[in-house]
From Swiss-Prot:
SUPFAM superfamilies: Family A G protein-coupled receptor-like. Residues 1-39, 90-113, 175-210, 273-287 are extracellular. InterPro entries: GPCR_Rhodpsn, GPCR_Rhodpsn_7TM, Olfact_rcpt, OR51/52/56-like. It is a multi-pass membrane protein. The gene is OR51F2. This is Olfactory receptor 51F2. It is found in: Cell membrane. It holds the Pfam family 7tm_4. One of its GO terms (cellular component) is plasma membrane. Disulfide bonds join 111-203. Belongs to the G-protein coupled receptor 1 family.
Length: 342
């Protein structure tokens, strides 16, 4: 069956709305117009997934194992890595399944679950970046009170509040998606479930879904972005009041990693929104490739940025790798000696 026939296939309402006995089945298109080359396109995507998963896992492992990194800044960094890791994994199975194995079918419940985690972790990343901006604000503007303001208990509360916020804004969106009826095309144009993509297939009024989706966006990234901007205005004002140019440079350098992380999250998001709004003349595969790449840019680049920019992370990674290598060699020597004496 061709992509055109799939997208035009009609399904009776009695069958489509029988979600309890037999959940609705949607078909993931992958990259429209590039079906013949999807296998080769998947290779760089797979490499990006490997880099994202291994890089963020390394950051989490290093922060967990190295006691010198048990500080507020690195706790927030581990939150960012955990979010990036989760964001990568929640689309990995369907994306590579579509590209490699033609596994295009996904039922409505699985689709809703994937959307919940996909959009939830995206909003979570925005919240973590805001928390990291607050960390930099306190470190530069109130250095003497840094450890008393950002205690372990307060950091845990910040992380929990971001999690609760995301669940609170995403749960109504998903519940109203569950109430939709679908009566025409069952083909999703991405390689994963995307909220806007799904509600456009509905044959019932989806205005409430659109409003809830917009509210979720504005109450998370729409709130976080201005707050991050405000924090850096206050940081710049504080840094410029420092008399020594060397101290000013050091203060700005402590923010470069976070500014880079904010840029690689918000700039692709803004670019993707502009392309969707104004790039109607662009081929459909351009939109889909951009959407897939956007999901992988922050998880791939964030570990690299923090590993390169922050010397403490570099030293901790090298230390952990050396210890692991030494432990492996020691075990090999023990095995060899045991074999000799036996």
């Amino acid at each position: 069956m061709t992509e055109t026939s799939l997208s035009s296939q009609c399904f009776p309402m009695s069958v489509l709305n029988n979600t309890i006995a037999e959940p609705l089945i949607f078909l993931l298109m992958g990259i429209p117009g590039l079906k013949a080359t999807q296998y080769w396109i998947s290779i760089p995507f797979c490499l990006l997934y490997v880099v994202a998963v291994s890089g963020n896992s390394m950051i989490l492992f290093v922060v967990l194992c190295e006691r010198s990194l048990h500080k507020p800044m690195y706790y927030f960094l581990s939150m960012l890595s955990a979010t990036d890791l989760s964001l990568s994994l929640c689309t990995l199975s369907t994306t590579l399944g579509v590209f490699w194995f033609e596994a295009r079918e996904i039922n409505l419940n699985a689709c809703i679950a994937q959307m919940f985690f996909l959009h939830g972790f995206t909003f979570m990343e925005s919240g973590v970046l805001l928390a990291m901006a607050f960390d930099r604000f306190v470190a530069i503007c109130y250095p003497l009170r840094y450890t008393t303001i950002l205690t372990n208990a307060r950091i845990a509360k910040i992380g929990m509040s971001m999690l609760i916020r995301n669940v609170a804004v995403m749960l109504p969106v998903m519940l109203f998606v569950k109430r939709l009826s679908f009566c025409s095309s069952m083909v999703l144009s991405h390689s994963y479930c995307y909220h806007v993509d799904l509600i456009q297939l509905s044959c019932t009024d989806n205005r409430i879904n659109s409003i809830l989706g917009l509210f979720a966006l504005l109450s998370t990234t729409g709130f976080d972005c201005p707050c991050i901007l405000l924090s850096y205005i206050l940081i710049i004002r504080s840094v410029l009041s420092i008399a020594s140019s060397e101290e000013r440079r050091k203060a700005f350098n402590t923010c470069t990693s976070h500014i880079s992380a904010v840029s690689i999250f918000y700039l692709p998001l803004i670019s993707l929104s502009l392309v969707h709004r104004y790039g109607h003349s662009a081929p459909p595969f351009v939109h889909i490739i951009m959407a897939n790449v956007f999901l992988l840019i922050p998880p791939v680049l964030n570990p690299i940025i923090y590993s390169v920019k922050i010397k403490q992370i570099q030293k901790a990674i090298i230390k952990v790798l050396i210890q692991k290598h030494s432990k492996s060699n020691h075990q090999l020597f023990l095995i060899r000696d045991k074999a000799i004496y036996e």
